[in-house]
Amino acid sequence: MATSSETPLQEKCGPMECTVSWTGGAGTRSKMGFVAETGSGHVLAMDGAPDDTRPDNGGLNQAPRPMETLLAGAGGCTAYDVVLILRRGRHDVRGCSVHLTSERAQEDPKVFTRIHMQFTVTGRNLKSETVERAIALSHDKYCSATIMLGKTAEITTGLTLVEV
């Protein structure tokens, strides 16, 4: 149950934890593979891209790269918010996807410098202004992932609305 200081979208937010372990020890095929086990008990594999110039540094491309999981997390966070905002407003939303494209700095630490999020929202009688407001609320107020990434990246959005 929300306390008086929580907004409707906020979950109980306590500390999060995760253990990330390298899977590339002696006798394994993996070079730069990692497995993350989240505090909620889920497992996520990550791997690096092959590096032809420095084979010992590269991965085997067997799982998403760590920065891809960061980008995917931001997409999941904002899509979650948009669907929840629209559903709570009793709008007939039937689908939501977001395609993210990004640019990164050329030099270390190679942070994201630009991220574009192209939303495709499907529903009945949805008004673009309503969906755009839900997207803006997510980016400006609720989505901790995009708000953090916005400290280094210019984040832009687009919307394709599909009537069913």
Segments (PLM) and residue ranges:
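Extended beta-strand/beta-hairpin segments
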Residues: 1-72, 83-164
